C-alpha cells in the first residue's frame, strides 16, 4: 500500500535510508547516535520535511514487511527545511562529525574534505535545457529522494510512490518537478528517464538535474 507517511513511520524510514545509503555521511550520523548521543539526527531531518509538506512524504507499506520504501521532497518556494534542521541541530552535527572524524570514519572524512575542496564563488551548475525557465519557483517542486529496500525492488513500489508524490504536487498548482542524481548512478538515471524526465542542468561530471512537466 502506498500512503502518506506519519511521524510513527520515522524509525522505519530511517532504517530504509540506512540500508539504501549505507555509506553516506548522513547514515554515519544515524548509525553512531547511540554511541555519541544526542538522538538520531536522521529522524530530526526527515521530521522537518514531514511537518512542512506532509502530502509530499509517502511510504510503501508492505503487508508483511512494513515500510519498505519512501519518497519525499519539497516546494521550491518553501525550501527552508534544511536551514531549520541545521539551526536546531548545528551543535549536534558538528560534535558528531568531529567524533566520527577522530574515529577515522571514512564517509565522514570524504564529506568534510569534499566540502573544503568544492567551494565555488558562483554556482557551477550549467543549464543545458532552458525551455521551462519561465516557470517560477512558486510553481516548482523538488523530488529529494525515492528509495526502496533492495529485496523489495522490482515490485512497482518506487513507481507507485513517485506517481502519488507527483500527483500531490500537481494538485497544489505545481507545474514542474526537479530531481538531482549523481552522474555515476546509472540505475537511478535509467529509472527517471523511463518516466519521461528531461535533462535540465549539469555539474561537471558529478551531478545531473532532471525536470518533469506536470
Which positions does each model-derived feature cover?
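A short helix-loop-beta-strand connector motif used in the catalytic cores of GNAT acetyltransferases and
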Residues: 44-59, 77-81, 142
Amino acid at each position: 500500500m502506498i500512503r502518506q507517511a506519519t511521524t510513527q513511520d520515522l524509525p522505519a524510514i530511517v532504517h530504509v535510508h540506512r540500508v539504501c545509503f549505507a555509506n553516506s555521511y548522513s547514515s554515519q550520523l544515524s548509525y553512531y547516535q547511540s554511541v555519541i548521543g544526542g538522538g538520531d539526527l536522521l529522524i530530526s531531518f526527515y521530521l522537518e520535511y514531514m511537518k512542512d509538506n506532509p502530502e509530499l512524504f509517502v511510504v510503501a507499506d508492505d503487508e508483511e514487511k512494513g515500510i519498505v520504501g519512501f519518497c519525499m521532497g519539497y516546494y521550491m518556494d518553501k525550501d527552508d527545511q534544511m536551514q531549520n534542521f541545521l539551526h536546531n541541530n548545528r551543535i549536534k552535527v558538528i560534535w558528531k562529525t568531529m567524533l566520527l572524524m577522530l574515529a577515522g570514519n571514512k564517509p565522514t572524512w570524504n564529506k568534510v574534505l569534499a566540502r573544503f575542496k568544492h567551494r565555488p564563488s558562483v554556482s557551477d551548475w550549467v543549464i543545458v535545457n532552458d525551455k521551462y525557465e519561465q516557470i517560477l519557483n512558486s510553481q516548482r517542486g523538488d523530488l529529494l529522494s525515492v528509495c526502496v529496500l533492495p529485496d523489495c525492488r522490482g515490485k512497482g513500489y518506487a513507481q507507485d510512490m513517485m506517481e502519488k508524490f507527483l500527483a500531490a504536487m500537481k494538485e497544489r498548482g505545481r507545474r514542474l518537478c526537479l530531481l538531482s542524481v549523481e552522474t555515476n548512478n546509472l540505475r537511478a538515471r535509467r529509472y527517471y528517464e523511463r518516466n519521461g524526465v528531461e535533462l535540465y542542468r549539469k555539474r561537471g561530471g558529478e551531478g545531473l538535474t532532471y525536470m518533469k512537466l506536470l
